[in-house]
Amino acid sequence: MPTISQLVRKGRKTIASASDSPALKECPQKRGVCTVVKTTTPKKPNSALRKVARIRLTNGYEVTAYIPGVGHNLQEHSVVLIRGGRVKDLPGVRYHIVRGALDAAGVANRMQSRSKYGAKKPKQK
């Protein structure tokens, strides 16, 4: 335990916490280009084919991002917007693609939680 005079001389060091999404560099979203679009399997005990994309960001980082929703139109060279947010059962996936922005189309026929999936309000008859 330090003495008062030691604290006056040196002070206390603050521990800097590591960012959950370092590639964003404190930005809310970043733009990038898809280099690979593929499916991966989640870790135990889950089982599925999760859609992910490898993305080269405008700041030079290359990250893996999850493609949410049912079906997508992404392929190599698609320009996408990514946000932070990990996928718990996919190791190394710390970002989500924003649906309905840039080249990523919104989810078709989505009625609930539409804003999260970039779906337009259906026409009333």
Curated annotation (Swiss-Prot):
What keywords does the record list, in alphabetical order? Methylation, Ribonucleoprotein, Ribosomal protein, RNA-binding, rRNA-binding, tRNA-binding
A GO cellular component annotated for this chain's UniProt record is: ribosome
Origin organism is Clostridium botulinum (strain Hall / ATCC 3502 / NCTC 13319 / Type A)
Task: Give the function comment from the record.
Answer: With S4 and S5 plays an important role in translational accuracy. Interacts with and stabilizes bases of the 16S rRNA that are involved in tRNA selection in the A site and with the mRNA backbone. Located at the interface of the 30S and 50S subunits, it traverses the body of the 30S subunit contacting proteins on the other side and probably holding the rRNA structure together. The combined cluster of proteins S8, S12 and S17 appears to hold together the shoulder and platform of the 30S subunit.
Q: What is the lineage of its organism?
A: Bacteria, Bacillati, Bacillota, Clostridia, Eubacteriales
What family is reported?
A: Belongs to the universal ribosomal protein uS12 family.
The protein's gene is named rpsL
3-methylthioaspartic acid is carried by which residues?
A: 89
GO terms classed as biological process: translation
Q: What is this protein called?
A: Small ribosomal subunit protein uS12
Give an example GO molecular function.
tRNA binding
Q: Kindly state the subunit structure of this protein.
A: Part of the 30S ribosomal subunit. Contacts proteins S8 and S17. May interact with IF1 in the 30S initiation complex.
Which InterPro entries did the record assign?
NA-bd_OB-fold, Ribosomal_uS12, Ribosomal_uS12_bac
